[in-house]
C-alpha cells in the first residue's frame, strides 16, 4: 500500500451552501484528467435516484451505500473517491484515513453541524486528518446575509431526517433564533 500521494479534501457547511456542487466539480475535474473516480452517496437519501444531485439539478453517478465498508473492495480500483453526505457514515474517519494512506484522493462533502448547531463528531474528527478543509456558507433564507447554519422546519427531534427546502432552511446566526 502506498503511503504517499493520498489526500483528504473536506468540504463542510450548512444545507444549501454548495457542498455537493463543489464535490461534483472536483470529481469532474479529476475525470477530465483521466483519473478513475468513484462517487458514493448515502443510501437512505433516495431523493434523486442513484446519483448525487445538487439542489440546482447538477448530477453525477454515484453508488448508494449505508456503510463505506461495502464499497471498500471497489475502491481498490479507483484513484479518487467522492463521498456525499459524509456526516451519515459512522466509519468515515477510519475509511478516509485508510484510503488516503493507500494513495487515494478523497473528496468529502458533509454538514459540519446538526439543525441544533451541534457538531457532527465524525466530521470534526476528520478535520485534523485532512490536507484541505473548505467551509462554505449559504445565503440566509430570511435576511439574505451569509448563512452558516441549517434550521429544521417542523418539530422532529431526530438528527437524521433527509430532506431539502421542504425540511430545512439555511440561516445566519440572528435568524437561527427566530
From Swiss-Prot:
Protein name: Thymidine kinase
Catalytic activity: thymidine + ATP = dTMP + ADP + H(+)
InterPro entries the record matches: P-loop_NTPase (IPR027417), Thymidine_kinase (IPR001267), Thymidine_kinase_CS (IPR020633)
Residue numbers binding substrate: 115, 159-163
Gene that produces this protein: TK
Its EC number(s): 2.7.1.21
Active-site annotation: 85
Organism: Myxoma virus (strain Lausanne) (MYXV)
Presence of the UniProt keyword Nucleotidyltransferase in the record: no
Amino acid at each position: 500500500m502506498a503511503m504517499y500521494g493520498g489526500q483528504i479534501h473536506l468540504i463542510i457547511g450548512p444545507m444549501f451552501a454548495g457542498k455537493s456542487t463543489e464535490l461534483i466539480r472536483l470529481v469532474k475535474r479529476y475525470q477530465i484528467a483521466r483519473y478513475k473516480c468513484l462517487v458514493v452517496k448515502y443510501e437512505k437519501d433516495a431523493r434523486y435516484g442513484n446519483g448525487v444531485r445538487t439542489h440546482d439539478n447538477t448530477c453525477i453517478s454515484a453508488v448508494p451505500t449505508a456503510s463505506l465498508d461495502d464499497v471498500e473492495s471497489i475502491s481498490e480500483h479507483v484513484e479518487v473517491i467522492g463521498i456525499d453526505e459524509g456526516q451519515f457514515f459512522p466509519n468515515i474517519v477510519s475509511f478516509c484515513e485508510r484510503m488516503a494512506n493507500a494513495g487515494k484522493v478523497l473528496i468529502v462533502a458533509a454538514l459540519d453541524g446538526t439543525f441544533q448547531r451541534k457538531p457532527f463528531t465524525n466530521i470534526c474528527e476528520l478535520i485534523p486528518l485532512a490536507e484541505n478543509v473548505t467551509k462554505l456558507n449559504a445565503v440566509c433564507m430570511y435576511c439574505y446575509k451569509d448563512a452558516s447554519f441549517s434550521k429544521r422546519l417542523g418539530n422532529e427531534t431526530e438528527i437524521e431526517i433527509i430532506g431539502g427546502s421542504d425540511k430545512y432552511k439555511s440561516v445566519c446566526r440572528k435568524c437561527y433564533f427566530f
